[in-house]
């Protein structure tokens, strides 16, 4: 899912993770602390004991947590903050996004785990990163506001 900064991607994704009653979920945040996420969850009034919050950006640690907890649903917030030690480039680079997304895709396919990836957008409104990112996922959602910023459009 992509969208402008502040449009509500993280909040909507957290709502999805928390509302998945009966499903074990792992919410991985590369942008906020666990405390910040818990405060947002309290504000939106949804609780789920089966939702684990994991603030992390190193892909290898994220995959280890996924393997350890075996969640039904994983939320990655956001793909541009995740990096692997296998590459010398910085998080958010085309090569990092490609490698991290490919690793997550491989894990999802081998285990049946659903992975929801949040991505930033460029100034022209397209998903930031390699175009291949849009081709390896099952669905691309664009989250936008209306002209008055009253409503959100998915």
Where are these regions (language model features)?
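Phosphate-binding/switch region of NTP-binding enzymes
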Residues: 105-154
């Amino acid at each position: 899912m992509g969208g402008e900064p502040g449009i509500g991607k993280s909040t909507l994704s957290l709502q999805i993770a928390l509302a998945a009653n009966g499903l074990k979920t792992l919410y991985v945040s590369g942008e906020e602390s666990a405390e910040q996420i818990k405060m947002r969850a309290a504000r939106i009034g949804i609780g789920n004991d089966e939702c684990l919050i994991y603030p992390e950006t190193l892909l290898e640690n994220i995959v280890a947590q996924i393997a350890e907890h075996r969640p039904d649903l994983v939320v990655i917030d956001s793909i541009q903050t995740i990096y692997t030690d296998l590459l010398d480039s910085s998080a958010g680079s085309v090569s990092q996004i490609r490698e991290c997304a490919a690793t997550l895709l491989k894990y999802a396919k081998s285990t049946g785990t659903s992975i929801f990836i949040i991505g930033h957008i460029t100034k022209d409104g397209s998903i930031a990163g390699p175009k291949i990112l849009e081709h390896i996922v099952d669905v691309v959602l664009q989250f936008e506001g209306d002209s008055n910023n009253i409503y959100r459009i998915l």
